Amino acid sequence: MTIEYTKNYHHLTRIATFCALLYCNTAFSAELVEYDHTFLMGQNASNIDLSRYSEGNPAIPGVYDVSVYVNDQPIINQSITFVAIEGKKNAQACITLKNLLQFHINSPDINNEKAVLLARDETLGNCLNLTEIIPQASVRYDVNDQRLDIDVPQAWVMKNYQNYVDPSLWENGINAAMLSYNLNGYHSETPGRKNESIYAAFNGGMNLGAWRLRASGNYNWMTDSGSNYDFKNRYVQRDIASLRSQLILGESYTTGETFDSVSIRGIRLYSDSRMLPPTLASFAPIIHGVANTNAKVTITQGGYKIYETTVPPGAFVIDDLSPSGYGSDLIVTIEESDGSKRTFSQPFSSVVQMLRPGVGRWDISGGQVLKDDIQDEPNLFQASYYYGLNNYLTGYTGIQITDNNYTAGLLGLGLNTSVGAFSFDVTHSNVRIPDDKTYQGQSYRVSWNKLFEETSTSLNIAAYRYSTQNYLGLNDALTLIDEVKHPEQDLEPKSMRNYSRMKNQVTVSINQPLKFEKKDYGSFYLSGSWSDYWASGQNRSNYSIGYSNSTSWGSYSVSAQRSWNEDGDTDDSVYLSFTIPIEKLLGTEQRTSGFQSIDTQISSDFKGNNQLNVSSSGYSDNARVSYSVNTGYTMNKASKDLSYVGGYASYESPWGTLAGSISANSDNSRQVSLSTDGGFVLHSGGLTFSNDSFSDSDTLAVVQAPGAQGARINYGNSTIDRWGYGVTSALSPYHENRIALDINDLENDVELKSTSAVAVPRQGSVVFADFETVQGQSAIMNITRSDGKNIPFAADIYDEQGNVIGNVGQGGQAFVRGIEQQGNISIKWLEQSKPVSCLAHYQQSPEAEKIAQSIILNGIRCQIQ
């Protein structure tokens, strides 16, 4: 992985201080300027060489964390190396061809022979002179705002590529092996009986180049039933960039978008929308319009502006929208040059099937079905395809074929309208039942999704499915075929006539925020489902309703649920919960140490069974330790009432999360549990543990920062260990990920040359982020010249090996790093364009005063050479 280094602290401090002395403007002009030495104080002020600050920004060679803007549009926060250029007083930004891709600027047609270069860096390669290669281009750097502005003609800017990373920048990562684990031990006892169990789950794998080998398993042991082990999900995987797809060989699951998902052992090849530009990965309509003059086009959604551009006279197309949400129509306003305005509305609602016009999504699977409850596992071929036809229609289709006489085909449409988004599809199945006949049937499905903007009511899903009497889905068909071929003794033989299968199914979900005159009164939800079945005539249903709100003293929620089973029995329940921060009870506005909140839950089933639970939880200042205590009382209609008390604690160690709980009940029963989860990565630098577990599909980063033990990665729980490595799993494939180190918890006296890096990993990769550090004792030196004059501000300080270890600040005070117990330093600067240097000796004292981990060395005398 190519690391993008960040802040050069000493350089930035030097520049900021010097700007204050010179009363610099926020933005530096590119024109030559001459500074008046009378602004500087000191005997030797007139001899200080200020020429390096006469040409634009006073940038010196180094690595700076900058905000990159292209044509005044923010692109990325990234580290840029500034290199020294012959004939230039100030360093210039080293912009490479790779940077142009990152900034979504088309690469100029150049080669090594005719490239116009600022410089050539051994690590970065060619530093391009954009002002020569791209006509009318300019590059400006604002030191105070740490902003790098690149202006190029609009024709050079890639279209529809906001937040997109070119495939040439996707990283395979390093070769590595990894293992994630979750272990849990449980012990319970009641008078006269003990029960114990152990559970362990593992996700492991290995990365070799672009290939990922993965497997998972779990182990169970119980006092009564003994032990068993299950090893599954064994596969190799890689992406295929040219197809924007993923390839899996081995055990995987078919997609559940078109048909019900099943486990297979074979091959799966499917398109991956994460590889597409964000403007193509999600649904949004293409806007067509006509401008009479040079016009400004503004698009709003829900009252918020989401897009604005300027178009020339004539027809225009806007195909790079990134709406803020679904369900609210788009309002398009065309403002002509004379001030006249025209407005029209573009319907915008979406269901999961909707795609942008011209965008396709596909999935192909083939292999042996893996189903635990059948004896004969057939081979399956399944394929599906979705395609955005226009702003209003997305078509999709799919097929399933097995080698035991089952086929199914599907056709469907997704529709975007002003009254919401609809989808409709029909599936036709054909199955041959052994010793019976061939059955054909259909299943019809309709769904609706709508946001009612006036009331903010979200009807997330209202779906209805009807299946004819002879329709069978794949899972039902395989189960029935297997039960007919392998009947169980003493049971009625299975057939299509007595096999229970779904007939109707309805699901509804409504969410309603309650707001009035900009005041929030909480939110309300309602959801329900109902289904019935062929053959058995049974039906099931479930309904729930709830309300939640937050107030100045805390939050609360109430919900109720009712369900009916196949026999018509009802099961009712009601829940009421309160959460009150302890600082509210104490009347303070700051977080208190110890416990942070009190939570209360009350529930009842209206059958004489009621429960009250009260708990309090908290966490340590560094969030590594969390804990809670709880107590409760249960009223049982059919048995004796029960009370309990318990506690829980967890610790985020460098090797994983350790947790334990204990509880005791009034019936003399006891429960104790211990658990841990985490993971580790084996790489060329050794074995590095992570205190976060990760799944087989997670993308990881191994971070190296020698000597930076204790630094948090991405401000989370993962830290750098004593060997200078750490692991984090919070990465998104095919997107720019900023890997940052929080240096507030550093345990050693070490300086990071950079505190963040940028990585663009492929799916499942392990990228390597190398943070350069400077280890060794740091010191604050108070230095004077042997001739009594002041050492010039910003003079460089060198150790005995010729390495720059610091710079002189105001009043001869300097911060240096990497000094020995005793030794010599040399200081160099320019006076009247002539080099001047002095030599000084230092020696550490055990009694020396310290600021943090830096010692203070006074009375350092520098002898003029």
Curated annotation (Swiss-Prot):
**Subcellular localization, per the record?**
Cell outer membrane
**What Pfam families is this protein classified in?**
PapC_C, PapC_N, Usher
What disulfide bonds does the UniProt entry report for this chain?
838-862
Q: What is its main location?
A: membrane
One term under GO cellular component: cell outer membrane
PROSITE patterns tied to this protein:
FIMBRIAL_USHER
Q: What induces it?
A: Repressed by H-NS. Induced by heat shock.
Molecular function in Gene Ontology: fimbrial usher porin activity
Key word ATP-binding present? no
Instruction: Specify the protein's topology with respect to the membrane.
Output: Multi-pass membrane protein
Q: Does the keyword Nucleus apply?
A: no
What span is annotated as the signal peptide, if there is one? Answer: 1-29
The annotated consequence of gene deletion is:
Deletion of the operon under classical laboratory conditions does not result in any major effect on E.coli capacity to form biofilms compared with the wild-type strain.
GO annotations under biological process? cell adhesion; pilus assembly
> What does the UniProt keyword field contain?
Cell outer membrane, Disulfide bond, Fimbrium biogenesis, Membrane, Signal, Stress response, Transmembrane, Transmembrane beta strand, Transport
Q: What does this protein do?
A: Part of the yadCKLM-htrE-yadVN fimbrial operon. Could contribute to adhesion to various surfaces in specific environmental niches. Probably involved in the export and assembly of fimbrial subunits across the outer membrane.
Checking PANTHER family in the record gives:
OUTER MEMBRANE USHER PROTEIN, OUTER MEMBRANE USHER PROTEIN HTRE-RELATED
Q: What else is known?
A: The operon is cryptic under classical laboratory conditions, but is functional when constitutively expressed.
Family note: Belongs to the fimbrial export usher family.
Protein name per UniProt: Outer membrane usher protein HtrE
- Organism of origin is Escherichia coli (strain K12)
